[in-house]
């Protein structure tokens, strides 16, 4: 049930703004009272330029005649999450924050498992469960790949099914899907679609152990069965990138990146229709649980259930299956990508040094240990449009990265640069070991379609020397750089705030999109 959702409806922008204060050049704090029932403050990591985007959205909201439909501005959503039962320390927004379903995209919130009332919310994970990014390195250089980038882009386009409704070429029976949902990358390894090292360089080692396929509906499985090893549409892509700058040579070398001009491949995809259906199914069950348990929220999109409830446990088990599916999906596309490169360059993938640098999730909820008010607690950390960024010496990151901190992969927009960051101790203390995940929308998909022409977007990419293959050209306006914030501003804000550290900058030379 909702409560107090419109209690602040009559406030002017100046009245709203009085609750939001800058406490440093990279952080705003949203005080309790901004929305009803806040248990903790909101914290928004933005520099001066990005701050204006957040506040402009709030100003536009205050100037509207009526608030019906659509999403609340991100700052409201951050505050509404701060009112959820069991939330600790703060509801945190990263610099790429923008409004989404329930939680803002770019929101991190943690809930105390020692609190019987603490909740889990599908809106805090999102519909594309374990949407994430994987980076492969190679021993190839731009000088070698540049002359064949058009042919290589076409080869990737031919090997990896892309676009809305795309069907996979990885043979998957219903029994195999059940196994993949339970086993994650262990299934990929068993079936020959992954290398053992791939698993070591994946968040959670590519498998959430609490997965229970019996908690995934038949409809979700039906949607997921034909989509294994497919890229999908929207902001998903496979991109051939060049190392453009190295900021931390020690960390980069640990990742196998040792020179400017080195070729890498970035794959951005998630759990496709299966994950979307898991989220949809859970929302209905949680609305009933809220009525039964008397859980009150400020926004009905924040449907949730107690972590300890049957509905909460069922969602977490199904979400884990969708997360495992996404890791299998990215592993399958890695297999297809390695095939495409091997065919183009006449060498097996291992001779091309096509190793996984790391694979990170952007939409997930996980049980983690964090210090809160001087006490170690087990928390259910929701990351929606944000990335885990654990520091050096953390036990949950691979041996290879114990001295550097976890690699964090930040995808840019179509045609702009991407980054590799590393996790820090300050991030562990301040943001539950989390940082940004990308550029973050500055313009809605609908508005992008109305103000941009797809021919212009494609022409700009070509003038930058970027080979592009797109399954749905008329949708590329939604993903144009003009539709997003500046990813460099986002990354620099996180670096300046100390919650992650810049390591490598990558620029695209070929893009494959749905």
Curated annotation (Swiss-Prot):
<feature type="binding site">
    <location>
        <position position="131"/>
    </location>
    <ligand>
        <name>Mn(2+) 1</name>
    </ligand>
</feature>
<keyword id="KW-0479">Metal-binding</keyword>
<dbReference type="GO" id="GO:0005525">
    <property type="term" value="F:GTP binding"/>
</dbReference>
<feature type="binding site">
    <location>
        <begin position="411"/>
        <end position="414"/>
    </location>
    <ligand>
        <name>GMP</name>
    </ligand>
</feature>
<comment type="function">
    <text>Catalytic subunit of the tRNA-splicing ligase complex that acts by directly joining spliced tRNA halves to mature-sized tRNAs by incorporating the precursor-derived splice junction phosphate into the mature tRNA as a canonical 3',5'-phosphodiester. May act as an RNA ligase with broad substrate specificity, and may function toward other RNAs.</text>
</comment>
<feature type="binding site">
    <location>
        <position position="418"/>
    </location>
    <ligand>
        <name>GMP</name>
    </ligand>
</feature>
<feature type="binding site">
    <location>
        <position position="128"/>
    </location>
    <ligand>
        <name>Mn(2+) 1</name>
    </ligand>
</feature>
<dbReference type="GO" id="GO:0003972">
    <property type="term" value="F:RNA ligase (ATP) activity"/>
</dbReference>
<feature type="binding site">
    <location>
        <position position="131"/>
    </location>
    <ligand>
        <name>Mn(2+) 2</name>
    </ligand>
</feature>
<keyword id="KW-0436">Ligase</keyword>
<feature type="binding site">
    <location>
        <position position="236"/>
    </location>
    <ligand>
        <name>Mn(2+) 1</name>
    </ligand>
</feature>
<keyword id="KW-0819">tRNA processing</keyword>
<comment type="similarity">
    <text>Belongs to the RtcB family.</text>
</comment>
<protein>
    <recommendedName>
        <fullName>RNA-splicing ligase RtcB homolog</fullName>
        <ecNumber>6.5.1.8</ecNumber>
    </recommendedName>
</protein>
<keyword id="KW-0342">GTP-binding</keyword>
<dbReference type="InterPro" id="IPR036025">
    <property type="entry name" value="RtcB-like_sf"/>
</dbReference>
<comment type="subunit">
    <text>Catalytic component of the tRNA-splicing ligase complex.</text>
</comment>
<dbReference type="GO" id="GO:0072669">
    <property type="term" value="C:tRNA-splicing ligase complex"/>
</dbReference>
<dbReference type="GO" id="GO:0005634">
    <property type="term" value="C:nucleus"/>
</dbReference>
<feature type="binding site">
    <location>
        <begin position="437"/>
        <end position="440"/>
    </location>
    <ligand>
        <name>GMP</name>
    </ligand>
</feature>
<feature type="binding site">
    <location>
        <begin position="362"/>
        <end position="363"/>
    </location>
    <ligand>
        <name>GMP</name>
    </ligand>
</feature>
<dbReference type="GO" id="GO:0046872">
    <property type="term" value="F:metal ion binding"/>
</dbReference>
<dbReference type="GO" id="GO:0006388">
    <property type="term" value="P:tRNA splicing, via endonucleolytic cleavage and ligation"/>
</dbReference>
<keyword id="KW-0464">Manganese</keyword>
<feature type="active site" description="GMP-histidine intermediate">
    <location>
        <position position="437"/>
    </location>
</feature>
<dbReference type="InterPro" id="IPR001233">
    <property type="entry name" value="RtcB"/>
</dbReference>
<feature type="binding site">
    <location>
        <position position="513"/>
    </location>
    <ligand>
        <name>GMP</name>
    </ligand>
</feature>
<dbReference type="GO" id="GO:0170057">
    <property type="term" value="F:RNA ligase (GTP) activity"/>
</dbReference>
<keyword id="KW-0547">Nucleotide-binding</keyword>
<feature type="binding site">
    <location>
        <begin position="235"/>
        <end position="239"/>
    </location>
    <ligand>
        <name>GMP</name>
    </ligand>
</feature>
<dbReference type="Pfam" id="PF01139">
    <property type="entry name" value="RtcB"/>
</dbReference>
<dbReference type="InterPro" id="IPR027513">
    <property type="entry name" value="RtcB_euk"/>
</dbReference>
<feature type="binding site">
    <location>
        <position position="268"/>
    </location>
    <ligand>
        <name>Mn(2+) 2</name>
    </ligand>
</feature>
<feature type="binding site">
    <location>
        <position position="362"/>
    </location>
    <ligand>
        <name>Mn(2+) 2</name>
    </ligand>
</feature>
């Amino acid at each position: 049930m909702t409560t107090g959702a419109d209690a602040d409806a009559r406030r002017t922008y100046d009245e709203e703004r009085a609750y939001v204060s800058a406490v440093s050049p990279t952080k705003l704090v949203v005080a309790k009272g901004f929305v009803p029932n806040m248990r903790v403050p909101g914290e928004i990591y933005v520099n001066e330029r990005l701050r204006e985007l957040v506040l402009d959205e709030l100003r536009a909201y205050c100037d509207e005649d009526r608030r019906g439909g659509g999403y609340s501005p991100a700052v409201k959503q951050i505050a509404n999450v701060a009112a959820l039962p069991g939330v600790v320390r703060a509801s945190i927004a990263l610099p790429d924050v923008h409004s989404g379903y329930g939680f803002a995209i770019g929101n991190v919130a943690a809930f105390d498992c020692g609190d019987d009332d603490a909740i889990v919310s599908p809106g805090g994970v999102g519909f594309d469960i374990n949407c994430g990014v994987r980076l492969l390195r190679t021993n190839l250089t731009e000088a070698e790949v540049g002359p064949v980038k058009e042919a290589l882009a076409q080869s990737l386009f031919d090997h990896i099914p892309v676009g809305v409704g795309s069907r996979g070429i990885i043979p998957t029976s219903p029994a195999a899907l059940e196994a993949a949902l339970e086993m994650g990358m262990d299934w990929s390894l068993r079936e020959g679609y992954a290398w053992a090292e791939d698993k070591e360089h994946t968040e959670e080692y590519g498998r959430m152990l609490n997965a229970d396929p019996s908690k995934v509906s038949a409809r979700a499985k039906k949607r997921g069965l034909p989509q294994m090893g497919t890229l999908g549409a929207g902001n998903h892509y496979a991109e051939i990138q060049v190392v453009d700058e190295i900021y931390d040579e020690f960390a980069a070398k640990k990742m196998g990146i040792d020179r400017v001009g080195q070729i890498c491949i970035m794959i951005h995809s998630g759990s496709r229709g299966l994950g979307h259906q898991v989220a949809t199914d859970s929302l209905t069950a949680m609305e009933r649980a809220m009525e039964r348990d008397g859980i009150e929220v400020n926004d009905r999109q924040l449907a949730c259930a107690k972590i300890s409830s049957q509905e909460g446990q069922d969602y977490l088990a199904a979400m884990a299956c969708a997360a495992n599916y996404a890791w299998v999906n990215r592993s399958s596309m890695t297999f297809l990508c390695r095939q495409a490169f091997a065919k183009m360059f006449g060498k097996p993938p291992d001779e091309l040094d096509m190793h996984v640098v790391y694979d990170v999730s952007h939409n997930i909820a996980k049980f983690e240990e964090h210090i809160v008010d001087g006490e170690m607690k087990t928390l259910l950390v929701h990351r929606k449009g944000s990335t885990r960024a654990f520091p050096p010496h953390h036990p949950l990151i691979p041996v290879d990265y114990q001295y550097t901190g976890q690699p964090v992969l930040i995808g840019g927009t179509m045609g702009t640069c991407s980054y590799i960051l590393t996790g820090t101790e300050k991030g562990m203390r301040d943001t539950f070991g989390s940082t940004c995940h990308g550029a973050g929308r500055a313009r809605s998909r609908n508005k992008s379609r109305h103000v941009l022409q797809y021919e212009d977007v494609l022409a700009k990419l070509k003038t930058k020397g970027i080979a592009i293959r797109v399954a749905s050209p008329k949708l590329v306006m939604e993903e144009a750089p003009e539709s997003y914030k500046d990813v460099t501003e986002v990354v620099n804000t996180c670096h300046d705030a100390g919650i992650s550290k810049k390591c490598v900058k990558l620029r695209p030379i070929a893009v494959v999109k749905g």
